[in-house]
């Protein structure tokens, strides 16, 4: 599909309110495409798009495709979606989000962030660095970047900063100039046939890096290290805590609202060997790694080190990544997107490092039955750095499959393996009641999950 011809088409996004779909549709609209879409319900992303004069249908119906000539779908769209069925019946071209994204940015110099965890924060950190320069990149992210108050922005330069979604393998269609591979974990196994299949997708993506580009690979990740052994070309740099990293993290100091660290740089033909006193308004070793990946790319692009440090220091954050929502009885309540065992573990680890004298309370809402079934054992060990867990009902995201095991026994396994106190709540009103009766003393509360838990956290201040 040629982009010049596509501007004459009407592009319909099924599930336009999704975080990745909303960003892509916004950029296409601002590029001059005719854009419309549908979603099952209204949300903040839909409201942002409506302000851009994008026509949005609430509810999925074949009638919504009346003027559509191209359909864009994400991995969240099921085969029985009535609009997808109608598009196939009418032989309207159906394109995956990742492939459409690749087409839109095919003529740009792309900085592409991939990996199982940390993509959104890393993409946002790169954006913050670029904002210290006169470069004006196009940005498409998987979360709302606070400094631009949106998930996406159409820039005027030939640079783009992209978060690429690995859930359906379509990230493989994007041609990176520079890329960051944060980590690779067992996830989206409904698409990937095996872990080897997942690894090969990432390996093939890395191999697409042109000779004039660079891949930045976090060497602290075990699977990343496996892939490094299979890469024959040398246009990649590594970053992390390990001694053989090209960008080695040193002298970490973490506080309640920020972290400081140094980097030892080991690169051929460079005048920069040590970068000291880097400050980021984030906690957690995982976020330090994310910022070093962003720094490495920015250096390769040619951004001066002081501007890079300023961009990291001035980072305004991204929504749903350890955001403070409110305080109650002098207890701070945070919201975080963590919904995979690894994400839960690293967030709680970061919190424990700086809030060691506090009781750490995690309100957890599992997201998708399929994920819980696939990673059940890992979930039971994920809460070791918490003191207590409030377990909410599963947010199914429309899945109609059976859990296949007792949810109560799952809760007992969390108590046993993570060594925490655990309380189960049946619904949001019960959660409110529990919190009102039990939140006192020296505590910190983090709501975690990718479903409705974020809305719950924002409703709590009105009800407590």
Report the location of each language-model feature.
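Nucleotide phosphate-binding/pyrophosphate-handling subdomain across enzymes
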Residues: 2-12, 20, 24-31, 180, ...
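Conserved N-terminal Rossmann-fold NAD(P)-binding element of oxidoreductases
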Residues: 11-16, 448
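C-terminal helical cap/extension that packs against the catalytic core
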Residues: 380-441
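Phosphate-binding loop of NTP-binding sites
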Residues: 3-5, 13, 20, 27-33, ...
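Beta-strand->loop->alpha-helix junctions that form or flank phosphate-binding loops
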Residues: 38-39, 57-60, 95-102, 140, ...
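NAD(P)-binding Rossmann-fold cofactor-contacting core
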Residues: 33-48
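Short acidic low-complexity segments
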Residues: 55-67, 430, 435
């Amino acid at each position: 599909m040629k982009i010049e011809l596509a501007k004459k088409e009407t592009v319909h996004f099924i599930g336009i309110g999704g975080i990745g779909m909303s960003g892509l549709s916004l950029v296409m609209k601002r590029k001059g495409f005719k854009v419309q879409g549908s979603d099952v319900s209204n949300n903040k992303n839909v409201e942002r798009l409506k302000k851009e004069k994008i026509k949005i249908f609430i509810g999925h119906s074949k009638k919504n495709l009346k003027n559509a000539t191209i359909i864009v779908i994400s991995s969240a769209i099921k085969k029985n979606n009535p609009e997808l069925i109608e598009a196939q019946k009418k032989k309207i071209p159906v394109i995956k989000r990742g492939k459409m994204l690749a087409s839109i940015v095919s003529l740009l110099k792309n900085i592409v962030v991939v990996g199982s965890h940390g993509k959104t924060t890393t993409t946002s950190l790169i954006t913050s660095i670029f904002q210290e320069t006169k470069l004006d990149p196009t940005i498409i992210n998987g979360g709302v970047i606070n400094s631009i108050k949106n998930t996406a922005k159409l820039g005027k330069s030939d640079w783009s900063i992209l978060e690429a979604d690995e859930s359906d393998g379509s990230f493989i269609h994007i041609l990176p100039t520079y890329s960051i591979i944060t980590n690779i974990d067992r996830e989206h196994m409904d698409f990937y046939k095996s872990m080897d299949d997942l690894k090969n997708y990432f390996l093939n993506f890395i191999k697409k890096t042109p000779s004039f580009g660079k891949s930045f690979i976090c060497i602290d990740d075990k699977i990343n290290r496996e892939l490094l052994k299979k890469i024959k070309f040398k246009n990649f740099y590594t970053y992390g805590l390990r001694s053989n990293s090209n960008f080695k993290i040193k002298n970490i100091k973490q506080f309640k609202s920020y972290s400081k660290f140094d980097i030892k740089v080991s690169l051929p033909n460079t005048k920069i060997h040590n970068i000291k006193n880097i400050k980021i308004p984030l906690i957690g070793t995982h976020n330090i790694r994310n910022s070093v990946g962003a720094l490495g790319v920015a250096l390769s692009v040619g951004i001066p080190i002081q501007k890079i440090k300023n961009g990291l220091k001035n980072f305004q954050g991204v929504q749903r990544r350890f955001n403070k929502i409110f305080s109650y009885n002098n207890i701070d309540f945070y919201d975080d997107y963590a919904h995979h065992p690894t994400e839960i573990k690293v967030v709680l680890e970061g919190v424990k490092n700086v809030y060691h004298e506090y009781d750490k309370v995690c309100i957890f809402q599992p997201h998708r039955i399929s994920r819980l079934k696939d990673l059940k054992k890992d979930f039971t060990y994920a809460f070791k750095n918490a003191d207590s867990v409030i377990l909410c009902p599963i947010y199914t995201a429309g899945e109609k499959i059976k859990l296949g095991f007792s949810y109560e026994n799952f809760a007992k396994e969390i108590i046993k393996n993570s060594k925490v106190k655990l309380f189960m709540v049946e619904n949001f009103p019960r959660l409110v009641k529990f919190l009102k009766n039990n939140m006192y003393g020296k505590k910190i509360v983090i709501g975690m999950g990718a479903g409705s838990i974020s809305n719950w956290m924002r409703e709590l201040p009105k009800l407590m």
